[in-house]
Amino acid sequence: MENKTTNLCKILLIEDDVVTNFITTSKLNNLGYSNITAVENGKEAIDYLKDNKPDLIVLDLNMPIMDGFEFMESKEQNCICMGVPIVIVTSSGRPSDKEKAKTFLDVISYLEKPLNYDKLQKILMSLRQCLK
């Protein structure tokens, strides 16, 4: 029963690193989340969001073409999928990035790589209660 509810959650994973993308998708699958769409940069994510609305966005900051901050700016300026929670997952240890991330409306968490999947699972569990 728990997995049925969990599987309803649509997750957009925005991550350019193929290995990290694969590992994160696999870990989310192991946690019962199977409705995951993965894209490699912010531009692909914006294109995806024009026709789709996920329940959660997991976002890397450092990507080619359109990075995470540019993605969030474009998303807000174009009022695309407002209210969809964003979990930032980044290798950037810069305090300025963490502070800048707090200025965006939908950012609910900032996690540093290597990703602590227990923390991500707790975030997903708390969100799942809101998504029912």
Predicted feature descriptions by range:
Residues 1-10, 116-132:
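Non-catalytic signal-transmission and effector/linker regions of two-component phosphorelay proteins
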Residues 15:
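Conserved acidic carboxylate
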Residues 18-37:
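Two-component/phosphorelay signaling modules centered on CheY-like receiver
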Residues 38-47, 68:
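Helix N-cap/capping motif at the beta->alpha junctions
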Residues 60:
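Active-site residues of response regulator receiver
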Residues 63:
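Receiver (REC) domain active-site loop signature in two-component systems and cognate sites
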Residues 70, 82, 93-110, 122-126:
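Alpha4 helix (beta4-alpha4-beta5 surface) of REC/receiver domains from two-component response regulators
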Residues 89-90:
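Hydrophobic/aromatic residues positioned on beta-strands within the core alpha/beta folds
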